């Protein structure tokens, strides 16, 4: 199997910025393996990682793929093929990346700070915050309330590589407000309600 090329790992986007650490955020559709491992290890901590945690385990990148590139969900050794390891290494080795944001799992809306080597993983986290969004559209599965994760970026907070984020729901409510900073995972927050809406036909 050909080795995947990770455009992110090459760092060409840093050139021309005086080689200083640039605060940044990353966005993908499907969560990385560290998300599934954090969920399994930490469990449900609604006052430290507020959000809905209804989809266990996380549907993640490389799910159902064998290491040799074959898709075979029925083989236990192919439940996770490791094809996102290069991307995780690039994220964990890039200074200034404050958060990775994704969706895909409609029933998960939490964030978690990945700052250790997790059991069964070959990549050690560097303090990047991993965050789900909120179910946004009227298609797809589930009856979780629709909304959006909003990310508030200010110059003052960027000096400390910190951003604020919360969910703005279709009901008008704001839930899950947290500061993604050096003490996230240890700071206490109100739990997020698990609200649902009727599916429109």
Language model segments and positions:
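His/acidic metal-ligating clusters that form di-metal
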Residues: 1-109
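Binuclear metal-dependent phosphoesterase catalytic core
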Residues: 72-75, 108-201
């Amino acid at each position: 199997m050909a080795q995947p090329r990770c455009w992110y790992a090459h760092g060409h986007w840093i050139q021309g910025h005086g080689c200083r650490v640039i605060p940044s955020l990353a966005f993908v559709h499907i969560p990385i393996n560290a998300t599934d491992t954090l969920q399994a290890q930490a469990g449900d901590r609604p006052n430290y990682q507020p959000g809905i945690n209804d989809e266990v385990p996380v549907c993640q990148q490389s799910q159902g793929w064998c290491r040799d590139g074959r898709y075979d969900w029925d083989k236990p050794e192919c439940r996770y093929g490791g094809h996102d390891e290069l991307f995780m290494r690039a994220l964990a080795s890039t200074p200034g990346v404050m958060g990775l944001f994704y969706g895909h799992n409609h029933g998960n809306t939490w964030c978690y700070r990945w700052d250790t080597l997790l059991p069964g993983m070959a990549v050690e986290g560097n303090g990047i915050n991993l965050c789900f969004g909120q179910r946004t559209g009227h298609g797809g599965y589930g009856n979780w309330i629709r909304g959006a994760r909003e990310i508030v970026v200010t110059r003052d907070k960027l000096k400390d590589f910190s951003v604020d984020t919360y969910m703005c729901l279709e009901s008008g409510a704001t839930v899950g407000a947290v500061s993604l900073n050096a003490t996230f995972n240890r700071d206490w927050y109100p739990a997020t309600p698990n609200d649902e809406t009727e599916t429109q036909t």
